[in-house]
Amino acid sequence: NVTASRDGRIFASVHGMRRGSAQLIEIQPGQNNWQPFPNAEWNGKPGSGKNVLNSAHGVAIDSQDRLWVIDHGNWMPNDAKPTRPKLVAFDINTRELVYRYDFPESATGTIMQDLAVDGERGFVYIADCGSNPAIVVVDTNNNTSRRFENHPSLQAENVDAIVEGEKLLFPNSEGKMQPARVPVNPITLSADGDTLYFGAMNGETWYSASAKSFREGASDYPSGTLRDRTIGAAIK
């Protein structure tokens, strides 16, 4: 995933299935010119410590020059167990960690991929394309998270993804390759932060809903899973 700052700096995450020497990088002018971000320590061996990016994926920069990164903790090397997912944010100018949220143990094994950030209101919306697809809402003001799940808009459609003229294939539970069917993945906000847009990676439908309904749901449900029917009704 790639994101750019207002002054043209470019940052990218490196997919865990193609793990290299870094999980999060800043791309600089010139061929093959990049450096680990924010430093080498955060790009250390996956699973080697608390302050390490194990599987950096979705990245986004907000209006305050904070680089937000979702680390879903899967695709660990040497058959190691997945780690707890975390959401972190770094100041791109000082390279300092300015926010961190460690998801509960129950979130281990989920596949949080893309994210949309409302830095002004303090909410982050994350697409979880795992076996139980969901939109995860993180309230950074109160350090809480909630899930919106069990809705048809989150599911993959029976549509093939074509890459360079070929069907995208993923291994099934038996290791056999089959056409990918990935649920909710792309997710973004309108410029004013009022509307959330999302869809499945395998699909042709783009959905929208009031971001306010997600924010209010996160504050109205102090515990458990967010199952607000008004959110489902608001999806178009």
PLM feature spans:
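Short loop/turn segments immediately following beta-strands, especially the blade-tip
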Residues: 140-145, 208-221
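Beta-rich, blade/repeat-based domains predominating
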Residues: 1-7, 48-66, 105-124, 154-195, ...
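A short loop-to-beta-strand structural motif that recurs across blades of beta-propeller domains
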Residues: 22-25, 85-88, 134-136, 205-207
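Beta-strand-rich domains and repeat architectures in extracellular enzymes and scaffolds
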Residues: 1-22
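A short beta-strand motif characteristic of beta-propeller blades
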Residues: 34-49, 98-105, 146-147, 170-177, ...
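Conserved beta-strand positions in repeat-built beta-propeller and related beta-rich domains
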Residues: 12-18, 61, 69-73, 78, ...
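Blade-loop segments of beta-propeller domains
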Residues: 30-76, 80, 85, 99-105
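Asp-box/WD-like beta-propeller blade repeats and closely related beta-sheet repeat scaffolds
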Residues: 74-123, 127, 133
